[in-house]
């Protein structure tokens, strides 16, 4: 017996008049890609989504078709026209699916919510086993005020605890949503969203709730673009969960990984964990004659590896130096060394990596620090260099998009490494990340199709990564 499909429906029919951009807001650029591309990517990569339908307004059809083709979004099997209202777009999707079984699960999402967490899709799909309609919502945090718009006076202030803010996706059994729209299209009923239409047309139906995330914002006003860009700059731990896939790591077997700074610390652990998945690894560091601050040194090392393997699939730069001193107390030589290792070295690695990764459509991974968001006293050069690494990553991600090369940056919380111990001494147990956790997280980023992101690794991640590592090291 064939299982019923899970179909993602992305509503991309808006024109974005409130945004004031002069073009539909789903084409706003954030972190190197349009909002629509980010959203399609989430559904494309979700293992439970079988196919995707995009609902477009007519003038954007060719542009969406081009985006889908260039990105290779294989799950998108239809781009259909929507209508003036949101309900017209949903109705168009229902009509396109009229030959599908009634129990087909539909996950309907706004194209302009590009920060959707993968687990929300999973929870919606699971909840449809109990309900025929599901909404995603978060508790209201501000006081809700019921206003008379004619007099501009407060009518009442309801109890906030009973009110939630709706988001998307909204999920439905196809048969239920079709039945609701059959009644709705007869007229006389107003609905602001698909769940409200189900509630008004089918009062016997219970609508389940999945708890959303505050970061799942909708791009509506110009300030939302700024907020979304900042959220993409610092992806929270749930984003790491989104891209973590043990299967993809096993798919990296026999791929070639080069780690600059691989002789100790996080770099050494990346090599150790990578070997567990059958990845061919090469460590470059001063101990084997490679100076990250010397581009000729890196060029020679990469050429040697390529001569042996005939390819390089992934490159990681973990090389770093941290002087815990005021700027005034640092010697000129220490300043130059810090810049060369922490920033110039990253540039050298990126420049040298390009032709090799272009050949394999590979991945590059750099490392930043929480200090990139705000300069820290006693390590001004280090923190400013790490801010530069973030900006470099985001810029290069856009330059490399046409060549299908991925570049990301991992931002680990305080990690138990020799460099940190040397700078700060012995710190309390349980306050520092295990470098193996950071190593595993780094490999999952390499295995993903993400690009242009700064991905946090936090202590909470050890809760689930430690179980994976325990099985790996049995």
UniProtKB/Swiss-Prot annotation:
Family: In the N-terminal section; belongs to the IspD/TarI cytidylyltransferase family. In the C-terminal section; belongs to the short-chain dehydrogenases/reductases (SDR) family.
Catalytic activity: D-ribitol 5-phosphate + CTP + H(+) = CDP-L-ribitol + diphosphate; D-ribitol 5-phosphate + NADP(+) = D-ribulose 5-phosphate + NADPH + H(+)
One Pfam family named in its UniProt record: adh_short_C2
pH-dependence of activity, as noted: Optimum pH is 7-8.4 for D-ribulose 5-phosphate reductase activity.
GO molecular function: 2-C-methyl-D-erythritol 4-phosphate cytidylyltransferase activity; D-ribitol-5-phosphate cytidylyltransferase activity; ribitol-5-phosphate 2-dehydrogenase [(NAD(P)+] activity
Pathway(s) of this molecule: Capsule biogenesis; capsule polysaccharide biosynthesis
Organism, scientific name: Haemophilus influenzae
Name of the protein: Bifunctional ribulose 5-phosphate reductase/CDP-ribitol pyrophosphorylase Acs1
Job description of the protein: Catalyzes the NADPH-dependent reduction of D-ribulose 5-phosphate to D-ribitol 5-phosphate and the further reaction of D-ribitol 5-phosphate with CTP to form CDP-ribitol.
Region named Ribulose-5-phosphate reductase: 250-474
Keyword vocabulary terms for this entry: Capsule biogenesis/degradation, NADP, Nucleotidyltransferase, Oxidoreductase, Transferase
Chain's gene name: acs1
Any GO BP: isopentenyl diphosphate biosynthetic process, methylerythritol 4-phosphate pathway
Positions of region (Ribitol-5-phosphate cytidylyltransferase): 1-238
Domain of life: Bacteria
E.C. number(s) listed in UniProt: 2.7.7.40, 1.1.1.405
């Amino acid at each position: 017996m064939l299982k019923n499909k899970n179909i993602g429906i992305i509503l991309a029919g808006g024109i974005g008049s409130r945004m004031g951009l002069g073009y539909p807001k789903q084409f706003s650029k954030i972190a190197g890609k349009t909002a629509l591309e980010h959203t399609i990517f989430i559904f494309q990569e979700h293992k439970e989504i079988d196919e995707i339908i995009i609902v477009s307004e007519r003038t954007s059809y060719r542009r969406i078709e081009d985006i889908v083709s260039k990105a290779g979004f294989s799950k998108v099997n239809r781009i259909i026209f929507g209508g003036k209202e949101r309900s017209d777009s949903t109705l168009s999707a229902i009509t396109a699916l009229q030959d599908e079984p009634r129990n087909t699960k539909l996950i309907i999402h706004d194209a302009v919510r590009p920060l959707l967490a993968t687990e929300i899709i999973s929870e919606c799909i699971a909840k449809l086993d109990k309900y025929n309609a599901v909404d995603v919502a978060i508790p209201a945090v501000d006081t809700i005020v019921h206003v008379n718009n004619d007099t501009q006076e407060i009518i009442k202030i309801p109890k906030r605890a009973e009110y939630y803010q709706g988001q998307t996706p909204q999920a439905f059994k196809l048969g239920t949503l079709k039945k609701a729209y059959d009644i709705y299209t007869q007229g006389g009923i107003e609905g602001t969203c698909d769940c409200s239409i189900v509630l008004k047309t089918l009062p016997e139906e219970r609508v389940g709730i999945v708890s959303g995330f505050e970061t799942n914002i909708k791009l509506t006003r110009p300030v939302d673009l700024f907020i979304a860009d900042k959220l993409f700059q610092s992806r929270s731990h749930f984003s790491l969960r989104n891209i973590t896939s043990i299967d993809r790591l096993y798919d990296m077997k026999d791929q070639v990984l080069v780690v600059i700074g691989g002789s100790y610390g996080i770099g050494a652990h990346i090599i150790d964990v990578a070997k567990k998945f059958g990845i061919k690894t090469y460590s470059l560091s001063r101990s084997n004659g490679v100076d990250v601050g010397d581009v000729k040194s890196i060029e020679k090392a990469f050429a040697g590896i390529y001569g042996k393997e005939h390819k390089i699939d992934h490159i990681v730069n973990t090389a770093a130096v941290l002087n815990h001193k005021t700027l005034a107390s640092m010697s000129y030589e220490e300043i130059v060394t810090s810049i060369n290792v922490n920033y110039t070295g990253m540039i050298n690695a990126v420049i040298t990596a390009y032709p090799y990764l272009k050949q394999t459509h590979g991945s590059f991974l750099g490392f930043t620090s929480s200090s990139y968001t705000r300069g820290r006293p006693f390590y001004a050069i280090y923190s400013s260099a790490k801010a530069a690494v973030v900006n470099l990553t985001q810029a290069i991600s856009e330059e490399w998009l046409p060549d299908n090369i991925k570049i990301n940056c991992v931002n680990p919380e305080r990690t138990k490494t020799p460099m940190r111990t040397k700078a700060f001494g012995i710190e309390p147990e349980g306050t520092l990340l295990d470098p193996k956790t950071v190593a595993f997280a780094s490999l999952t980023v390499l295995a993903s199709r993400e690009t242009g992101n700064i991905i946090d690794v936090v202590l909470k991640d050890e809760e689930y990564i430690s179980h994976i590592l325990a099985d790996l090291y049995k």
